[in-house]
Design a protein with these regions (language model features):
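N-terminally biased helix-coil "hinge/interface" segments that flank
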Residues: 1-660
């Protein structure tokens, strides 16, 4: 048997599969326990396979933890070392990829030319002297050199010096990507360094849970492009798990609806909602690399658009902006009070009909984990006092302000939340679903009390308030889906993010237009994945003319997709030269051989592509490869491009081959 697990920001889902019969035996779902992932994984394994030991041969995992860490910027402090770059470069181009000039960046002397030759030798003793002090302010490091994909000498030498100075994670750009754009490689290395401890904690939790149950299966992880990799490979390159969860959800949608050929897939999670396109039964891939929030990576992933909207998104009401969505995930009030009876009693006694309570009385903060001695000493007096106060019981924002005498200034709660010390709890769509009876997992009475409070402040009744929130969700998902289809149209791609398109979408979603009605239609079906899909996807479909599908077991679609992937590796080798000699090289520019005849060059290129793809395939944990090598002829352009042809090698195997 095999198990597929998806650990999301809010829920952890699982499926138990009979490998021989290719049959789903059982599904399970449990809240993700961020303070200790072993708890939710243990619960899930107990639900799926109550007996210890057993014949679990394979465990495949997908997770949104890396993606959510990027979206919510819950990182450790990473020092970025750049060779061949300047502060002006970062000011001019860094923002476009998510890197801004900051004290966290060190511009090292030394550099390479575009052929990979050393054009400026660094003063390594001086570099080491700088690093002795500079490295003390960081938890991890990323090292990237311009043209470093052609020559790794600068990155690897710097890594060795840092390694001798400190025992902290160090990642080089050359270890992750051969992308020409060094800033995109810098983003990859920067994120990989920060995600390493997050992913290591996740994997350790999984293996400990399995070991306690006497289970020792083969483990693999879903990559952002929908293929899978071994546990060892994933630990080295956790950045490749970015969009792992969304990729698995699309694979799950395809598996649950085998007849589906063309679709817009919306995965509604707890933290984000993701939209992707399935065309001719295959998932569209973004070859330029995954973009997560402001970060443009060079990691290939599914072509996806993400909105910070999920079941655990905060609903904010204020006089300036009215009802709108908060930033990041919060703990639904209906779920939080289940753990804290005192807060449940507080809501039960709250008189929302006659009391003049500020909105801050319904926003709570709970202690998530205590800071260590070093981190605790770095907190200011108010932050330390907040930690001490929350040890006893969660406190409302209003109570904290009264306690510390800060009527309007920041209490440092944002810092405490970002670093995982406290957890915010507020009204969310999950609470609204409790009130309407569409989803019951927590305390409905608390959700109802909170809704009455918010509705009163908005000048409406509770039922109208809930209906308004549902429409806000449906409209945002509708706009996300239509924009995804617009970006897929080559003639419209350039204007997809324009203000005019936004106004057009706002107009089409309007239900009180007097003179004109606009309704988009498409041959692509609308498919929903995720626990709330059955609630919201039909509402989204009402806004435009498409068929709507929510497959059975949509609530565990990610876990289904996790167990159905394949290991896939690719390698491309180029031949350059419109006449002899012919140069054979990797796409990154690394030279392989110079040949006097085109026939010899093609033989060398084919062999090199096969060798390269198998090397990467086995690194990812593949077995029994099926290898294909394809030649693509290109017409060389004199004086502009000497590219003659490209040999593309592919090696693949099914995930189930790993246990055969």
């Amino acid at each position: 048997m095999a198990i597929g697990i998806d650990t999301g920001g809010t829920y952890t889902d699982g499926v138990l599969i009979d490998i021989d019969k290719k049959e789903m035996l059982k599904t399970a779902k449990t809240p993700t326990t961020h303070e200790d992932l072993r708890i939710c994984i243990d619960r899930l394994l107990t639900d799926l396979h109550p007996n210890k030991g057993g014949n679990i041969a394979l465990l495949s995992l997908s997770t949104t933890l890396a993606t959510n860490a990027c979206v919510e910027k819950k990182f450790r402090r990473c020092g970025l070392i750049l060779f061949g770059s300047t502060d002006k470069d970062l000011q001019a181009y860094g923002r476009s990829v998510g890197l801004d000039t900051a004290p966290d960046t060190f511009f090292a002397k030394g550099g390479l030319d575009m052929s990979g030759n050393l054009c400026e030798e660094p003063d390594w003793p001086e570099f080491e002297r700088h690093m002795m002090q500079w490295q003390k302010g960081f938890d991890c490091f990323a090292i990237v050199s311009k043209w470093g994909m052609k020559n790794t000498i600068l990155e690897m030498t710097a890594k060795k010096i840092l390694f001798d100075l400190c025992d902290k994670p160090i990642v080089c750009g050359c270890e992750l990507s051969s992308e020409l754009n060094y800033l995109c490689r810098a983003v990859n290395a920067y994120l990989n360094a920060q995600l390493s401890p997050v992913f290591a904690e996740f994997m350790d939790s999984v293996k400990q849970s399995l070991a306690r149950r006497g289970m020792y299966p083969q483990i693999c992880i879903v990559r952002g492009d929908g293929t899978v990799m071994s546990e060892e490979y994933a630990r080295q390159k956790p950045v490749q798990t970015l969009l792992s969860g969304p990729a698995a959800s699309v694979l799950g949608a395809v598996a649950l609806l085998p007849a589906m050929q063309n679709a817009v897939v919306i995965d509604i999670g707890g933290t984000t909602s993701d939209v992707s396109i399935v065309e001719n039964g295959a998932v569209r891939i973004c070859e330029t690399g995954a973009r997560i929030d402001a970060f443009q990576t060079s990691t290939k992933a599914i072509d996806i658009s993400t909105a910070l909207l999920g079941g655990d998104t905060e609903i904010v009401a204020d006089l300036k902006n009215g009802i709108h969505w908060g930033e990041g995930r919060v703990w639904p009030l209906s779920m939080m009070v289940g753990r804290y009876p005192a807060v449940k009693e507080y809501f039960a006694a709250l008189d929302v009909d006659h009391g003049a309570h500020p909105m801050e009385d319904l926003v709570f903060y709970c202690l998530h984990k205590e800071p260590g001695a070093a981190a605790g000493s770095a907190l200011n007096e108010t932050e330390q006092g907040t930690i001490q106060l929350l040890k006893d019981c969660p406190q409302s924002l209003g109570a904290l302000r009264k306690r510390f005498g800060h009527a309007s200034v920041d209490l440092g709660l944002g810092y405490l939340e970002t670093n995982g010390y406290v957890r915010k709890s507020a009204l969310t769509p999950t609470d609204i679903m409790h009130v309407r009876g569409d989803f019951i997992s927590g305390d409905r009475a608390t959700a109802e009390k909170a809704v009455r409070f918010y509705a009163d402040r908005c000048g409406c009744d509770g039922e109208s308030f809930c209906a308004m929130i549902y429409e806000m969700i449906a409209q945002k998902l509708y706009k996300l889906a239509v924009k995804k289809l617009i970006t897929a149209e080559p003639s419209l791609f350039a204007i997809a993010d324009s203000a005019e398109i936004d106004r057009l979408l706002d107009f089409s979603a309007g239900k009180s237009n007097r003179y004109l009605h606009l309704k988009f239609n498409s041959d692509f079906s609308l498919v929903g994945i995720g626990a709330p899909a059955g609630i919201f996807i039909p509402r989204v479909a009402d806004y435009f003319d498409v068929s709507c599908l929510v497959p059975p077991n949509a609530q565990v679609g990610n876990a289904v997709g996790a167990i159905l992937g394949e290991i896939l590796a690719k390698c491309e080798v180029e031949i350059r030269g419109s006449s002899q000699p012919y140069e054979v090289s990797c796409v990154s520019g690394e030279k392989i051989e110079v040949c006097t005849t085109l026939t010899d060059a093609e033989a060398v290129a084919s062999k090199a592509a096969r060798k390269g793809v198998l090397k990467e395939f086995y690194k990812r944990g593949g077995v029994h490869p099926v290898v294909t090598v394809e030649k693509k002829n290109l017409e060389a352009i004199p004086f502009v491009s000497s590219l003659q042809s490209v040999f593309c090698a592919t090696a693949r195997c099914s995930i189930l081959d790993m246990i055969s």
